[in-house]
Amino acid sequence: MRKYEVMIIIDPTVEERQVDSLMEKYLKVITDEKGTVDNVDVWGKRRLAYDIQKKSEGIYVVVNATCEPATIQELDRLLAIDEKIMRTKVMRPEIH
């Protein structure tokens, strides 16, 4: 199992109270495959550095998880399909 950090930018038209239920739906993929979700940090609505899909704001969510590489690939694939998700970035945090 490896540690991953996933940054997700959600469409700003989604209400912020719906973000938790939206994330729960996707993070279930990790827990179903015997991985763990270590932390979910909702940063809220922030201005983007440049427009994405003609929008200048997005709701940022950072997820720290421990799981297998195939599981994180499936999560990234599912997030890419959803129109509410504007952008994702999967990273392996550096160990110091």
UniProtKB/Swiss-Prot annotation:
Pfam families: Ribosomal_S6. GO terms for biological process: translation. Keywords: Ribonucleoprotein, Ribosomal protein, RNA-binding, rRNA-binding. The keyword Cell membrane does not apply. GO terms for molecular function: small ribosomal subunit rRNA binding; structural constituent of ribosome. It comes from the Bacteria. One of its GO terms (cellular component) is cytoplasm. HAMAP family: Ribosomal_bS6. Binds together with bS18 to 16S ribosomal RNA. Belongs to the bacterial ribosomal protein bS6 family. This is Small ribosomal subunit protein bS6. It comes from Cutibacterium acnes (strain DSM 16379 / KPA171202). The gene is rpsF.
